[in-house]
Amino acid sequence: MSASAADAQTIAHPKSFLMASSAAHMTPQERTSSFSLASIFALRMFGLFIILPVFAVYARELPGGDSETLVGITLGIYGLTQGLLQIPFGVASDRLGRKPVIIFGLIIFALGSFLAASGANIWIVMLGRMLQGAGAISAAVTAFIADSVRVQVLTKAMAMVGASIGLTFALSLLISPPLTKLWGVSGLFTLTGISALIAVLVVKFVVPPAPQSAIDEKNEHRSWRKVVCDPQLVRLNIGIFVLHAVLTAIFVVIPTRLVYMRLPSEHHWWVYLPAVIAGFALMAPPLIFGEKKQAVVRVMRFMIGFLTVAFVLFAYLIHSIWEIAFLLGIFFIGFNVLEATLPNLVSRIAPAADRGLALGVYNTTQNIGLFVGGALGGAISQHFGPEAVFFVCASAMLIWFASSFGLQEPARPNREPGEVIK
């Protein structure tokens, strides 16, 4: 759940991983920057996550919502406009400053949310989702975090983001079905717009400015082609594309499958919440192992294979609620580890002056993945059945697994971003 964008968590609680990940301590300003920017991600992702578990079911009440393909496109079109605009927003934040670009994007996101809330049919909701995606701030926020902390504590800062997004996801799964029953999907979209406006206030009045040293670093820009075509970054971009495509694809299938099994949509959180908690509880050991043993890429590759097996099992074991709950728990372990690892690697490999551009490309591929996953997931499920969706997801994971070979282990956090170990 994407976001977006997201990073590490904990063994039993998010703070335990933060304490274990590095001996370096954050300064008060670094803590303020990290927590406040993590809250921006959380507020924005709350508006996206709260829709995800229920939209495929409740969209059927809208004119045009009886088509699984249209429902999938509506879920995923947010990712298409995000993908088209992440690079312009990232580059603009490199040159115009992070805060103005983030505020502008949040306002666009809020307008799209209110438009979707007013939608009388699937097409208006689709247009609202498209406008939501035009507020493409993920790259700018992630770059702002990397600007605001020393590289020694970058993993901790990204961990705060990941923990906030993960907890937001869990909360969304818990409250989404009852709120939908109370207010309807339009009420959820209104809540999404309000959360974006609250995030604007946080950016304006809470987030500290980036240190002057980070501003000075932006004077030395590399050719955009060198950044976009960097082989290390390309491998990571392929990964985030696949990861978010499969995420959206399975959430086109699973909610309707649970309804088919006679589990009312307002009770779907019974399945989702334990799965997310299990993913939280078990994701930290591989993250800590990867950092301590300088085996981040090896852990990433193992988790790609882990998810590939999970999708094959999904195709064969999706005939009971308990099987779905168990496999979702397995999925979220792998998803959380990979979601935590990828943006951290991009931030450490990308040159500081072009971090916004690099993260813009990264978030572009992430959000195009959201669109492709939603659109293809709906179409494949409609024409070939839900099992086919999981086989396609497994195939996509295998392609990612193959592309990950050649990815170099990143420098330890006490080295400069952009340095890799040969």
Question: Which ranges hold each PLM region?
Answer:
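Helix-to-loop junctions at the C-terminal end of transmembrane segments
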Residues: 85-96, 282-296, 381
